[in-house]
Amino acid sequence: MSGTKIHPTALVEKGAQLGENVRVGPFCHISSEAVIGDECSLTSHVVIMGKTMLGAKSKVFSHAVLGADPQNNKHKGGATILSIGKNCMIREGVTMHRGSDSSTGMTVVGDNCQFFCYAHIAHDCHVGNHVTFANNAMIAGHVTVGDYVIIGGGAAVHQFVRVGHHAFIGGVSALVGDLIPYGTAVGVQAKLAGLNIIGMKRAGLERQDIHALRHAVAMLFDHSKPFKERVNDVASCYSSSRSVADVVRFIKEEGKRFYCTPKFGGDRIK
């Protein structure tokens, strides 16, 4: 705990593990099972409950509550975990719940993520690296969010939904189906509105790869033949495309929800 400073009004329970150069501000409460990495900063009135691990160089702002019990009626009170990666920014009023003992027992957040005011992560979610949640964005239990995803303000994601890497969810959208990698979803209920071209360029994808994915997505959702056949056709036609391979892999993994499709994409695809 070399260099660590704890405000006299803060409550750090016996057994809590604090790294070096940690800053704990006024009226914070840290549980006995918490593990706080080096150079973390808790500004004031931060509550860290249960077995919560906060990665190095993360900053948590006022009235955030991390590691509370899951909002899951099947949870029986067993020991579960919230694991947050390094260099995350967690703004005012953010809530993240531990996993539930009826499921994986873990809620996992990756490195270099940003969670703006009042964002919410429910039990048993897995959030990747470099993810951004805008104000009041929220995901229900068991949701998987890939790397570099951006979720707009006030957007909500249904339980068990998968969000592919580099996807974008527009503000005040309600996503109830799996969103393919690089996809953009907007509206209530959210529909696939195209590709996250800006995100693809940031990921270093070449122009031809972006064009390939555009054509591949059109093939996937044209309803000219059974969905599995369309997936195989796309995989065969665009076998050299990195982005198309990502989408095909995502689809073949198969989640518990149907897919987020274009507005005129016909019936639900599972």
UniProtKB/Swiss-Prot annotation:
InterPro entries: Acetyltransf_C, Acetyltransf_C_sf, Hexapep, Lipid_A_LpxA, Trimer_LpxA-like_sf. GO terms for biological process: lipid A biosynthetic process. GO terms for molecular function: acyl-[acyl-carrier-protein]-UDP-N-acetylglucosamine O-acyltransferase activity. Pfam families: Acetyltransf_11 (PF13720), Hexapep (PF00132). Transmembrane segments: none annotated. Keywords: Acyltransferase, Cytoplasm, Lipid A biosynthesis, Lipid biosynthesis, Lipid metabolism, Repeat, Transferase. Its main location: cytoplasm. It catalyses: a (3R)-hydroxyacyl-[ACP] + UDP-N-acetyl-alpha-D-glucosamine = a UDP-3-O-[(3R)-3-hydroxyacyl]-N-acetyl-alpha-D-glucosamine + holo-[ACP]. It is found in: Cytoplasm. Its EC number is 2.3.1.129. Pathway: Glycolipid biosynthesis; lipid IV(A) biosynthesis; lipid IV(A) from (3R)-3-hydroxytetradecanoyl-[acyl-carrier-protein] and UDP-N-acetyl-alpha-D-glucosamine: step 1/6. It comes from the Bacteria. GO terms for cellular component: cytoplasm; membrane. NCBIfam families: lipid_A_lpxA (TIGR01852), PRK05289.1 (NF003657). Involved in the biosynthesis of lipid A, a phosphorylated glycolipid that anchors the lipopolysaccharide to the outer membrane of the cell. Belongs to the transferase hexapeptide repeat family. LpxA subfamily. Homotrimer. This is Acyl-[acyl-carrier-protein]--UDP-N-acetylglucosamine O-acyltransferase. The gene is lpxA.
